[in-house]
Amino acid sequence: MAARQQQKGTGFGVQYEDFVPKSEWKDQPEATILNIDLTGFAKEQMKVTYVHSSKMIRVTGERPLANRKWSRFNEVFTVPQNCLVDKIHGSFKNNVLTITMPKETITKVAYLPETSRTEAAALEKAAKLEEKRLLEESRRKEKEEEEAKQMKKQLLEEKEALIRKLQEEAKAKEEVEMRKLQEEAKAKEEAAAKKLQEEIEAKEKLEERKLEERRLEERKLEDMKLAEEAKLKKIQERKSVDESGEKEKILKPEVVYTKSGHVATPKPESGSGLKSGFGGVGEVVKSAEEKLGNLVEKEKKMGKGIMEKIRRKEITSEEKKLMMNVGVAALVIFALGAYVSYTFCSSSSSSSSSSPSSSSSSTKPE
């Protein structure tokens, strides 16, 4: 048995060891016999094939070893010229493969001359050399094919690895881009929600401020109205008091002292004078009241319209100025009425205090 020559591996982690078996040729008169020593191989682990194109016999086989290793062989033998190809047969016994190749013509070696034997030996040697050459060429081709196959397989594996790497990088990049887009969309959504909330809060504050301003305006107008009504009421009360005092002065009789006693006699002249005086003041006050009443009515109508405009936020600067002018005019009229009443009351009290003394001096008894 020949020694193991070289080891070859594949991408799957399995290593092959090439095995070169020993072979022996035997030339017999009836046939040519080839014995191949295949110790360690079973019959099912080998294969014998005849190649018609090259007239050669190919013997191949492989068997497993330990540690994911395999032993294999691939041998080629040339079939002799004087051979019946259809009757080639083989047998496997005691680890030896025997291939029998029957001859077309049976030769008797014992009766051949010496020259024939020499020629037969030379032919056999040439056949062995040709067989060796063909075997080496076949092995070289197989080696080249195996190397090409391994190179192709390696390139395919590298290509697949590169494709996997590119796919993984593209997938990772796509995931990063998708995560980035999601974060940007989330940030935009949060910013939009925050902006909307701020706008809503600002709008609510603006509405509250406008409502508060409207309430203040209404309260101011209400206070002005109440103040004007209070002043009007006060003037009316003062007027009623003044009128009642005038009536008492007009109806009070004048006492005249005589010798027989005192007699109350009215004085039409003075009464008419007082009446005329009271009448003049009354006319002034009455005119002021009428003007004030008209002004108040007008102010009420304007106030209602202005209040409606304030509620609708339609009041203008001219209407505000007009409201201020109306208030000032009312105050002026109230002051004028108060002044006239005060002047009249002062003159009435001074005349009443001087009249009794004059009457008493004129009616003093003799």
Swiss-Prot record:
Membrane protein topology class: Single-pass membrane protein
Ranges: B- repeats: 163-176, 178-191, 193-205
Keyword Transmembrane helix listed: yes
Keywords from the named record: Cell membrane, Membrane, Plant defense, Repeat, Transmembrane, Transmembrane helix
Region of interest (3 X 14 AA repeats B of [IMA]-[RK]-K-L-Q-E-E-A-K-A-K-E-[EK]-[LA]), residue spans: 163-206
Chief localisation class: membrane
Record-level GO BP terms: defense response
Region (6 X 5 AA repeats A of L-E-E-[SKR]-[ERK]): 129-220
Chain positions covered by the region annotation Disordered: 345-366
Subcellular location, record wording: Cell membrane
Highest taxon listed in the record's lineage: Eukaryota
InterPro entries: A-crystallin/Hsp20_dom, HSP20-like_chaperone
Homology family: Belongs to the small heat shock protein (HSP20) family.
Record's function text: Seems to not be involved in heat resistance. Unable to mediate restriction of long-distance movement of the pathogenic tobacco etch virus (TEV) without causing a hypersensitive response or inducing systemic acquired resistance.
Protein name according to UniProt: Inactive protein RESTRICTED TEV MOVEMENT 2
Organism whose genome encodes this protein: Arabidopsis thaliana
Gene: RTM2
